[in-house]
């Protein structure tokens, strides 16, 4: 059995040889690996036999998953967006990953929107984000916000590689359901990326850990606690074969929840001391959020930290101490809750604690000493491995998988065997969940089962597809449904309806039903129609994304041409005012002529802050036309050549 699975998966990771493959690899170009995180994202590429984690334009190897829209029409993504959160909280969007692929009625969505500074609205039974842009209020699907972050990672990679990138491997939490996986793929399409593979974050981290491990078979537990999600996966690693044995987790648990506990504590404390409730003041809340996050990070290395915020609320300052002990007390139940999935994974894998050879901690929240201590104690004092960077491991593994798919050298020995995280089945009489594919089944996989009708002469059966672990479908998650019609009249129990489930390498499900008597067949790819974007939606969002990119480009051109004129005018003004330099060489008439032209340009700038780039360029040319002859005359008098002007003619001069 294992051999068959291995063969299937070897085919799936694209390890076939021959000319056809080489041609295909050329078409793909360089495939990048992206860790699309709740709070931070990271991008890597496999080049020349090694992984490069790529720094963004700020020099940072991780980029905040933040998007902001400013009052002057600028769209900011990453560090720039996060840096202005406290001054523009209503139009700074984060945590899109906590909304993506979820329904409006989801209890987690309803919990989260109470704490977001931006407005979340219902549209087509799904959460959408409403912000003010320069064109007025605009509503975005979570997929669009995630697409903007993916687009930023794509740009970061393109700047490093010096060429366009069109294909990517994107990671998701292992416990993401079908709808969340589909929505993440859609976000990639909107960003102009073909997502070749969705892989699970702990699996990617295991690749990062185990890539160079050659010492025989090892059982590795990956404990991945990030900013917004938590996963545990147990893998067997053996000479380049990565087999996921079991996985579990919580798609709504992470560093942000720890921050929120601390914030709630300080908000209550402030109300008790000052009698003031800051919850309605978005700016104050976001200032507190920023400082609490910093304090949490500091407490990983020290035992207490002082939180100081000037002009916190209604002119008052904020000054409080947070100790590591208090931080742990506020979050102890959440920290302890991470051990339940660890226990579950061991049970599902039919292993004991002592069977685990290595524990790999991934995600920024595993830097919290108490989390490390709890994991260590759970495994009887076993020290977790510290060989990989918890912030970069997932992107690293994604980049390796991207290298495999694009046929990079030295990757042909890597085989990835992942599993589906949740049981999948259909509803049968009485609302019973009949399982077809149990959780932790190696994917890709296909499973069929024959069913029959529940009543005499029934000519239609409705196939309702669910995922979840509960015995009754009402307690599980409906993925989609379809009808098989035209069943010939027959007593109940006679017709034979074969239902087949097929899960692809991305963990995405296709279901078909066939009437064995007539050969009549229906099938659907589960796209969670109520939840999923339609192809029309995606096309519209792609157009919107392109429009935003054009607007960003135009804005950049406008800002650059404005800056050129401004710097030129002020630089001249300063030089003319300098009595030791240019100011001393000009006659009063020349000085007055230049000052008058410069003042006119500065006045025009103040009156036209949003002019077109061409207008700024024309103003600069006009100013140069007045300035250049005066300066040229000075240089000729001194027997030298005039300095190059700032206009187009500068390019014609010989270069040294």
Curated annotation (Swiss-Prot):
InterPro entries: ATPase_NBD, BIP_NBD, Heat_shock_70_CS, HSP70_C_sf, HSP70_peptide-bd_sf, Hsp_70_fam
Regulation of its function: The chaperone activity is regulated by ATP-induced allosteric coupling of the nucleotide-binding (NBD) and substrate-binding (SBD) domains. In the ADP-bound and nucleotide-free (apo) states, the two domains have little interaction. In contrast, in the ATP-bound state the two domains are tightly coupled, which results in drastically accelerated kinetics in both binding and release of polypeptide substrates. J domain-containing co-chaperones stimulate the ATPase activity and are required for efficient substrate recognition by HSPA5/BiP.
Subcellular location: Endoplasmic reticulum lumen
Residues that bear O-AMP-threonine: 518
Highest taxon of source: Eukaryota
Amino-acid positions noted as binding ATP in the UniProt annotation, renumbered to this chain: 37-40, 97, 227-229, 293-300, 364-367
Region described as Substrate-binding (SBD): spans on this chain: 420-500
CC annotations in GO: cytoplasm; endomembrane system; endoplasmic reticulum; endoplasmic reticulum chaperone complex; endoplasmic reticulum lumen; extracellular space; membrane; nucleus
Record note on modification: AMPylation at Thr-518 by Fic inactivates the chaperome activity. In response to endoplasmic reticulum stress, de-AMPylation by the same protein, Fic, restores the chaperone activity.
UniProt catalytic activity: ATP + H2O = ADP + phosphate + H(+)
Gene3D superfamilies attached to this UniProt entry: 1.20.1270.10, 3.30.420.40, Actin, Chain A, domain 4 (3.90.640.10), Substrate Binding Domain Of DNAk, Chain A, domain 1 (2.60.34.10)
Motif range (Prevents secretion from ER): 653-656
Family indicated by similarity: Belongs to the heat shock protein 70 family.
UniProt name for this protein: Endoplasmic reticulum chaperone BiP
């Amino acid at each position: 059995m294992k051999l068959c699975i291995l063969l299937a998966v070897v085919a799936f990771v694209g390890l076939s040889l021959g000319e056809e493959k080489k041609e295909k690899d050329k078409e793909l170009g360089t495939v990048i690996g992206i860790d699309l995180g709740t709070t931070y994202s990271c991008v890597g590429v496999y080049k020349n036999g090694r992984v490069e984690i790529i720094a963004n334009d700020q020099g940072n190897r991780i980029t905040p998953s933040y998007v902001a829209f400013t009052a002057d029409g600028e769209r900011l993504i990453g560090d720039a967006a996060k840096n202005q959160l406290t001054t523009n909280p209503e139009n700074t969007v984060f945590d899109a990953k906590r909304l993506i692929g979820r329904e409006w009625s989801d209890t987690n969505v309803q919990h989260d929107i109470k704490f977001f500074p931006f407005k979340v609205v219902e549209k087509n039974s799904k959460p959408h984000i409403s912000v003010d842009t320069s064109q007025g209020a605009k509503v975005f699907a979570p997929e669009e916000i995630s697409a903007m972050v993916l687009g930023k990672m794509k740009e970061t990679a393109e700047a490093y590689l010096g060429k366009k990138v069109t294909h990517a491997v994107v990671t998701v939490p292992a416990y993401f359901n079908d709808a969340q996986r589909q929505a993440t793929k859609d976000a990639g399409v909107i960003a102009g990326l073909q997502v070749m593979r969705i892989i699970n974050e702990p699996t990617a981290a295991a690749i990062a850990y185990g890539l160079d491990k050659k010492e025989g078979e090892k059982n590795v537990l990956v404990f991945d606690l990030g900013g917004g999600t938590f996963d545990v996966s147990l893998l067997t690693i053996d000479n380049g074969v990565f087999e996921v044995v079991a996985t579990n987790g919580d798609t709504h648990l992470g560093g942000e929840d720890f921050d929120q506990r601390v914030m709630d504590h300080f908000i209550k404390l402030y109300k008790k001391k000052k009698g003031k409730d800051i919850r309605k003041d978005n700016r104050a809340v976001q200032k507190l959020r920023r400082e609490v996050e910093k304090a949490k990070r500091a407490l990983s290395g020290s035992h207490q930290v002082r939180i100081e915020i000037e002009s916190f609320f209604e002119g008052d300052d904020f000054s409080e101490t947070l100790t590591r002990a208090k931080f742990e007390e506020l979050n102890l139940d959440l920290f302890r809750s991470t051990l339940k999935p660890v226990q579950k994974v061991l049970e599902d894998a039919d292993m004991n604690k002592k069977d685990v050879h290595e524990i790999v901690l991934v995600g920024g929240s595993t830097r919290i000493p108490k989390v490390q201590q709890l994991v260590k104690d759970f495994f009887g004092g076993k020290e977790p491995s510290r060989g990989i960077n918890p912030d970069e491991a997932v992107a690293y593994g994604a980049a390796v998988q991207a290298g495999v798919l694009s046929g990079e050298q030295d990757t042909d020995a890597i085989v990835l065997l992942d599993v589906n995280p949740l049981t999948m089945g259909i509803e049968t009489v009485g609302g019973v969940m009949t399982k077809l594919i149990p959780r932790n089944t190696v994917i890709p996989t296909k499973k069929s089962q024959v069913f029959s009708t529940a009543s005499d002469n029934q000519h239609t059966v409705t196939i309702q597809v669910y995922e979840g672990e509960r015995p009754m479908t009402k307690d599980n998650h409906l993925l989609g449904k379809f009808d098989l019609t035209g069943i010939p009249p027959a007593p109940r129990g006679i017709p034979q309806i074969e239902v087949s489930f097929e899960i692809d390498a991305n963990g995405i499900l296709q279901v078909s039903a066939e009437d064995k008597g007539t050969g009549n067949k229906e099938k659907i790819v589960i796209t969670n129609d109520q939840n999923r974007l339609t192809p029309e939606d995606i096309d519209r969002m792609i157009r919107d994304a392109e429009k935003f990119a054009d607007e960003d480009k135009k804005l950049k051109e406008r800002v650059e041409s404005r800056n050129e004129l401004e710097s030129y005018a002020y630089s001249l003004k300063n030089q003319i005012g300098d009595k030791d330099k240019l100011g001393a060489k000009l006659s009063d008439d020349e000085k007055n002529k230049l000052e008058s032209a410069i003042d006119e340009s500065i006045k025009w700038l103040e009156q036209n802050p949003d002019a077109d780039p061409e207008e700024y360029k024309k103003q600069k040319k006009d100013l140069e036309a007045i300035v250049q002859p005066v300066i040229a005359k000075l240089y000729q008098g001194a027997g030298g050549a005039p300095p190059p002007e700032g206009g187009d003619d500068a390019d014609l001069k010989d270069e040294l």
